[in-house]
Amino acid sequence: MRANGSELNGTVLPRDPPAEGSPRRPPWVTSTLATILIFTIVVDLLGNLLVILSVYRNKKLRNAGNIFVVSLAIADLVVAIYPYPLVLTSVFHNGWNLGYLHCQISGFLMGLSVIGSIFNITGIAINRYCYICHSLKYDKLYSDKNSLCYVGLIWVLTVVAIVPNLFVGSLQYDPRIYSCTFAQSVSSAYTIAVVFFHFILPIAIVTYCYLRIWILVIQVRRRVKPDNNPRLKPHDFRNFVTMFVVFVLFAVCWAPLNFIGLAVAVDPETIIPRIPEWLFVSSYYMAYFNSCLNAIIYGLLNQNFRREYKKIVVSFCTAKAFFQDSSNDAADRIRSKPSPLITNNNQVKVDSV
């Protein structure tokens, strides 16, 4: 091992990560990685700012469920503001030359973002489950005060989950991905715990919640007497599908990296040499790319967000104040009770993600 370098598998990091020591690659590889990062940063920043502004401006989007959506957008913004630009700099310089402190902060914020994202996605799934499957208790469970407390709890748990990395020494520079990140080979037991509590367990909870919702949706749609039986509004079903797609994309983007980490933790000496570099790098940049997808999904699948996006862009282009409330029509001022169920005689309008 070089005295001033880090091992290829990311097991050792000196106090000051060097610029040299990154693997030599064809120019098109680094160009591709840089392009992916630039696209991710730009779309992440613009998209998630649009999400936050949309909820701020539109009363129809200001509800308990969307508090978690804003929290998720903040988690995605974190990486676009600090860690990803540093990774991009590392790509351009073919190595890390920003020092030990920036390496640790970058790795910490990257972990904070991903754990915050999965915990917020779990919070959204539980919220949707209560909203659709336990609608009579929803107002009490998800009052404005309670919802803010839930989001606060999510971020407290996120910080608690990431802090041990600072003491275990697992935040290290890996030249293969030009990033200071969680080193999977530092401790097998710790890596297994991270994968289980930060990925597998949340995914299991979210899967359970959405499975129960799908079962209810199928049961409701098969009922033969709609006059007496409640049915799910199409609007609520579309909102559920939106958040389900967000979950599926997160799971797909992050699963390869987590399964690689699990395999490395089980048998590091055997697995590490067998993992192709292209697979390892692809799994990381696939995970990085996920941070810019949610805002796109909201715009594609949610009509309220799509309309608000357009209003914000028009306001910006015409130099109007885009921080003002855009909910001016009479329908927007009607405060409706959130409930996913309606009958033929009693329709309830709901506007949420």
Curated annotation (Swiss-Prot):
Q: Which organism is it from?
A: Gallus gallus (Chicken)
In its UniProt record, which GO terms are filed under biological process? adenylate cyclase-inhibiting G protein-coupled receptor signaling pathway; G protein-coupled receptor signaling pathway; negative regulation of D-glucose import; negative regulation of glycolytic process
Protein name as it appears in the record: Melatonin receptor type 1A
Q: Which InterPro entries match?
A: GPCR_Rhodpsn, GPCR_Rhodpsn_7TM, Mel_1A/1B_rcpt, Melatonin_rcpt
* Gene3D superfamilies recorded: Rhodopsin 7-helix transmembrane proteins
What spans does the record annotate as topological domain Cytoplasmic, numbered to this chain? 54-66, 127-145, 212-243, 299-353
Q: Coiled-coil regions in this chain?
A: none
Q: Which residues carry attached sugars according to the database record? A: N4, N9
Q: Which family does it belong to?
A: Belongs to the G-protein coupled receptor 1 family.
